[in-house]
């Protein structure tokens, strides 16, 4: 907690990029947001602090999900790598004894996963893919087919060029094959191959899909590993 002209706030070492950053939460932002904004900018002048937005490629590298892009109300926590928020074992800090929206359905889903069943069709995975460097936010979902081609089986949500790896990366949904990580949470099968149908702007050959392969998320470790990364197995 900090006090700036008696403005109470909470500082969290978190962010939307995976970098070493901080977020400031005012306890009453409806009244004092402008005060805090100006105070932070004034204090940062000597450090050449400036207003920017998080780099999309770092958000994607860190595997941080964007609401409406990587998930929405149609998805459940297990299929978008948030299964750690719902206890699979019935033990530990995520064993939610209190009631919450969707509890019965999620507990049933968790039980089915432990039994080797597949209670949903698509799983969010990390992909490395070919094509020309993707340097702009995708305005639409790009379709994914099996390695041998054919009809679409999934779709890309957040693609970008990875400058360190010199390849395109993406998060996307592909058919869930029942793979679980060491902690019992669903994930994609590392090394499984697909085809991605890129727009002409990024295609090596217009009309021809590029190769893609499932890799681990995050694509790059965050400065401060979050719970999702710790339990990813």
Q: Which residue stretches match the model-derived regions?
A:
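Conserved, structured C-terminal
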Residues: 4-233
């Amino acid at each position: 907690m900090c006090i700036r002209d008696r403005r109470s706030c909470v500082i969290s070492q978190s962010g939307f990029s995976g970098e070493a950053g901080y977020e400031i939460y005012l306890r009453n932002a409806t009244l004092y947001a402008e005060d805090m904004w100006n105070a932070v900018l004034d204090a940062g002048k000597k450090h050449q602090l400036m207003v920017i937005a998080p780099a999309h490629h770092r958000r994607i590298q860190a595997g941080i999900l964007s609401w409406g892009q990587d998930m929405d109300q149609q998805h459940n926590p297990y299929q978008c790598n948030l299964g750690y928020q719902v206890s699979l074992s019935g033990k530990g800090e995520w064993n939610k004894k209190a009631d919450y929206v969707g509890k019965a359905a999620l507990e049933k889903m968790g039980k089915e996963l432990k039994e080797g069943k597949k209670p949903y069709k698509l799983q969010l995975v990390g992909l490395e893919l070919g094509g020309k460097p993707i340097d702009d936010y995708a305005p639409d979902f790009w379709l994914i087919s099996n390695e041998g081609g054919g009809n679409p089986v999934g779709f890309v949500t957040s693609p970008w060029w990875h400058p360190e790896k010199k390849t395109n990366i993406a998060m996307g949904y592909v058919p869930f094959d029942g793979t679980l990580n060491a902690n019992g949470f669903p994930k994609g099968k590392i090394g499984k191959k697909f085809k991605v149908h890129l727009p002409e702007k990024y295609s090596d050959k217009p009309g021809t899909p590029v190769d893609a392969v499932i890799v681990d998320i995050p694509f790059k470790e965050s400065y401060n590993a979050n719970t999702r990364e710790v339990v990813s197995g």
